[in-house]
Amino acid sequence: MERLLDNKFSIEDVHEESLRPKTLEEYIGQQKVKEKIKIFIEAAKKRKEPLDHVLLYGPPGLGKTTLANIIANEMGVDIKITSGPAIERAGDLVAILTNIGENNILFIDEIHRLNRTIEEVLYPAMEDKKVDIVIGKGPSAKTIRLTLPPFTLIGATTRAGLLSSPLRDRFGIIERLDYYTVEELSQIVMRSASILKCDIEKEACIEIAKRSRGTPRVANRLLRRLRDYAMVKHTGSITYEVAKSGLEMFEVDEYGLDLVDRNILEAIVYKFGGGPVGLSTIAAAISEDEGTIEDIYEPYLIQEGFLVKTARGRVATQKAISHIAKIKFKLKESGDNR
């Protein structure tokens, strides 16, 4: 079953398109990044040049794709969207590059997953606006260098450390997107509820924001699920009490942790004495993929002070130990033996 708090893109998030802001003014949060991007855009427009190449990095669900679309909109240019895994051959990338219009934007999501051979096609394209095409095979093969129109590459990644230095160094603008505050998320929830024509109390927006793991994508997903819950179980309006009872039914606690997060913490606390314990051991203990734990669950647990990464492994903090003990006590009181 799909995880409600998963900050990765899902099929259902296609419906989120209507919730996406279209301008920097509408874009809530990431204030420092916004201010810098606004300056770079205005300067590029005054010079009548394309924006310098941009690398956006940070955890999933924080608005990298949205920001790329906003940049295109603010620059008044078209954007071509693709992803690292979708570009399987160097020829695929060459075809995309040779079809980009002047000053337009190419957005590559998960750019860290580009094959190194394919990545090398980008070097002359980004630096010199040139791309090499090989015609023919064997000894008679010839290389023709084509000139590309000026363009902007926007790359997005959740793992900036996996980018090769030659690629990373070719980006003139590198910005990290951070987790959102509760206040910012509550504004996003209120705005989304208005677009969805969903009646919601301010206190309910704050409650959703508190449990959204600092991530707009999660906040919007919780809002849609609570809209369903309110329509079926209540009058349709999302009050504070409706939000609280709905989130409890979805097993999303006051810290924004779900069953999977708690399984990780419980394994470290009860099976391995609080740690330190290796990632592979945790993964085996809860039957979860190592990469999924490291990329999806751990960043938030570390950010919120539940987990510490050391050279010897993962260690549960006192906050984690207290929280897990409190949950166990509540379950015991309610007769739940989990």
UniProtKB/Swiss-Prot annotation:
ATP binds at residues 19-20, 61, 64-66, 170, 180, 217. The keyword Metal-binding does not apply. It is found in: Cytoplasm. Coiled coil: none annotated. SMART domains: AAA. DNA binds at residues 309, 314. Residues 1-180 are annotated as: Large ATPase domain (RuvB-L). One of its GO terms (molecular function) is ATP hydrolysis activity. The keyword Hydrolase applies. Residues 181-251 are annotated as: Small ATPAse domain (RuvB-S). Keywords: ATP-binding, Cytoplasm, DNA damage, DNA recombination, DNA repair, DNA-binding, Hydrolase, Nucleotide-binding. Mg(2+) binds at residue 65. Its EC number is 3.6.4.-. Residues 254-338 are annotated as: Head domain (RuvB-H). GO terms for cellular component: cytoplasm; Holliday junction resolvase complex. It catalyses: ATP + H2O = ADP + phosphate + H(+). It comes from the Bacteria. Belongs to the RuvB family. Has 3 domains, the large (RuvB-L) and small ATPase (RuvB-S) domains and the C-terminal head (RuvB-H) domain. The head domain binds DNA, while the ATPase domains jointly bind ATP, ADP or are empty depending on the state of the subunit in the translocation cycle. During a single DNA translocation step the structure of each domain remains the same, but their relative positions change. The RuvA-RuvB-RuvC complex processes Holliday junction (HJ) DNA during genetic recombination and DNA repair, while the RuvA-RuvB complex plays an important role in the rescue of blocked DNA replication forks via replication fork reversal (RFR). RuvA specifically binds to HJ cruciform DNA, conferring on it an open structure. The RuvB hexamer acts as an ATP-dependent pump, pulling dsDNA into and through the RuvAB complex. RuvB forms 2 homohexamers on either side of HJ DNA bound by 1 or 2 RuvA tetramers; 4 subunits per hexamer contact DNA at a time. Homohexamer. Forms an RuvA(8)-RuvB(12)-Holliday junction (HJ) complex. HJ DNA is sandwiched between 2 RuvA tetramers; dsDNA enters through RuvA and exits via RuvB. An RuvB hexamer assembles on each DNA strand where it exits the tetramer. Each RuvB hexamer is contacted by two RuvA subunits (via domain III) on 2 adjacent RuvB subunits; this complex drives branch migration. In the full resolvosome a probable DNA-RuvA(4)-RuvB(12)-RuvC(2) complex forms which resolves the HJ. HAMAP family: DNA_HJ_migration_RuvB. This is Holliday junction branch migration complex subunit RuvB. The gene is ruvB.
